[in-house]
Amino acid sequence: MKVDIGERIKYWRKEKGITQDTLAKKADIPYTTLAKIESKIVTNPRMETLIKIAAGLEITVDELITK
């Protein structure tokens, strides 16, 4: 089964009650990068980016991908 990483990030971001802009700042990534991942323009982000996003969400990469 393929994980829709954009949907997973959006789910966790909304679960945490934060905006894309806030998450981008917490993850130290460009807002446009996050927006492209969530809107499925970028479907295979780099692992480094996923690690930063997970840290910004205060979850593990495993939680981001599997839960």
Task: Map each language-model feature to its residues.
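A short, Lys/Arg-rich alpha-helix, primarily the initiator
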Residues: 1-15
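Key DNA-contacting residues within the recognition helix of helix-turn-helix
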Residues: 10, 35-36, 65
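DNA major-groove recognition helix of helix-turn-helix/homeodomain DNA-binding modules
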Residues: 48-63
